[in-house]
């Protein structure tokens, strides 16, 4: 007989907490008894995928996590890297996918609030926010509603809390029609002498609850985020938290002030699983126990019971361990900032989380049973790739309509390029970032959309570093081509890391470290687990190749919705890579727009006449948008070529030879050239070489090849070409010249013109694509 057969709960009640029958048996074994309702809820949230990574932890263990600049790796609230000169950067990415599908404004807003708390809990002042967003078909009214809500939520919270939203990415694909992805990344500059850790210590030390009050909002949010979305869960608004950015601003200042007193032993924000997670993780990491009295917790609603206290995910709350005798000093700081602060418990030697309510024990669980000793599933990989992938890999370029110098099928190359520029994934995101205050704090060096990565000035406000003059900056980006990952997760994940490093290199930054957000479907299905495992393998390999260790991140699984026939439809596997890099000299930062008439254009990476699997139309934006086909093999990543191309690009920027740099990504080389022309309001005359042996669409729209488009001051051409010949002798090509805007964009293949468009045509198509679709409401 299993324990569940004699449980004081029905099978439906247990399943309602996200607990499987075999997991309930394990709970009884760990406790030596049946849990009560509050304890069942605590196990439900702490054993959810969102909190314990029970399906992904074995895969995450292969990631590289150590490096010369890594100060804090996985396991804390955020990673921390050493930037030199006493500057330390905290950074992390988190998801808020399910809440944003249900209530897009609050779901996205509280996602921003949560990631900011991860940063300042370490003792860092938040200096920048990025986001990686995925939505469905923008022609659909529901997608437009979600898009409006998510962007409004991000802008509301970030603008009000006073942290600039400086960059990120937005993509659209029908694969996300039912399940948008909202990943938020934040950066912070350390203000404290010591990094604040989460592990509790000091028997008898008081435990402080600080911040906002506790209510019933966000009940069971962690479990909600660890299950597929259904018609019922899409109406589950109580599982979505409600944030207050003005209160969070006060919390930032109060926490940083408190940390500087030296009276804080440990700190943990209350994010997923609220009080349950913060008490269990602090106790387990410190090898101690915690006693907490719920009657002392400040509340905003009456009649709450232990289950509700412990599972509430009310926002803007923190748990501190204070040095004994200094608790009042900390309480006074928080009261001065208009925040709640009470002693709600203490640290005990017995490694147990013990919860009191109305004078009795409401819950008593070994801390490690909630945090460390959780279920882990070692799932079996299929013997061969799934049928859908094998079938997609059979596609070849010969299956496309015939192409000539005029066009493909009945469409001209002009028309096809404009079609790609009109794709919301490629088009201008001005509608998005104009809603963000991207210059608050006055440290934003590059405006959103002007370069391949965000760049922020490092200007400490406190401590010895604030007295030094520094011209350093930090660059950050988020990247993933989910279509690649759907077709071939291993190569797609490698491509995400490579593109992130390439984007940083295009602004002159040295890639340093990675935070990842793994957005996938159900790992319990063979296809879902294969996608997850292959992507993790690719990420691990690529991070080692680029010497960019993983400092932490987030796993968001069960991103699936039921279609009209009741069949689950997973998203594309989307392993988002957040990467940070060091800009050694802010006077030498590069944008993507052409700068001066007469500048020479160079293609770094595989030249236009290359023909191997490092370039491909498989999985390309051209194939998906122009031919409504998702098939083929994405381009293979050549790590050695990537490293050499990126290094010479950074060198050219640091030397002042390169005036603009832009990587060739979605849409291929033609789109990259058009985007640089648009950004600089200048034209270009480009020749891609003879058509012999190549289709024109291969020359124009093939993706991959470690490619970067750069423009160079003519005065530096000789020294630049000498450096190229020394560093990447077979991987560069002079392809043209920057021209007056009136000359437009002219792309030829040998003597054969392919594209001739005015800069105004490019700007109008690219610049208004999203607004034209939103105007349909």
UniProtKB/Swiss-Prot annotation:
Q: What is its main location?
A: cytoplasm
Stored InterPro entries: PRibForGlyAmidine_synth_PurL, PurL_linker, PurM-like_C_dom, PurM-like_C_sf, PurM-like_N, PurM-like_N_sf
- Supply the EC number(s): 6.3.5.3
Where does this protein hold ATP?
53, 92, 516, 553
A biological process term (GO) from this entry: 'de novo' IMP biosynthetic process
- State the compartments where it is located: Cytoplasm
Q: Write out the pathway annotation from the protein's UniProt entry.
A: Purine metabolism; IMP biosynthesis via de novo pathway; 5-amino-1-(5-phospho-D-ribosyl)imidazole from N(2)-formyl-N(1)-(5-phospho-D-ribosyl)glycinamide: step 1/2
Supply the Pfam families for this chain: AIRS, AIRS_C, FGAR-AT_linker
Q: Which residues bind Mg(2+) 1?
A: 94, 554
Which residues are annotated as active site?
Answer: 50, 96
Residues given in the record as substrate binding sites: 95-98, 117, 241, 313-315, 556
Question: A GO molecular function for this record?
Answer: magnesium ion binding
Q: Which NCBIfam families match?
A: FGAM_synth_II, PRK01213.1
Q: Tell me the protein family, please.
A: Belongs to the FGAMS family.
Q: What is the annotated role of this protein in its UniProt record?
A: Part of the phosphoribosylformylglycinamidine synthase complex involved in the purines biosynthetic pathway. Catalyzes the ATP-dependent conversion of formylglycinamide ribonucleotide (FGAR) and glutamine to yield formylglycinamidine ribonucleotide (FGAM) and glutamate. The FGAM synthase complex is composed of three subunits. PurQ produces an ammonia molecule by converting glutamine to glutamate. PurL transfers the ammonia molecule to FGAR to form FGAM in an ATP-dependent manner.
Q: What is this protein called?
A: Phosphoribosylformylglycinamidine synthase subunit PurL
Which species does this protein come from? Answer: Synechococcus elongatus (strain ATCC 33912 / PCC 7942 / FACHB-805) (Anacystis nidulans R2)
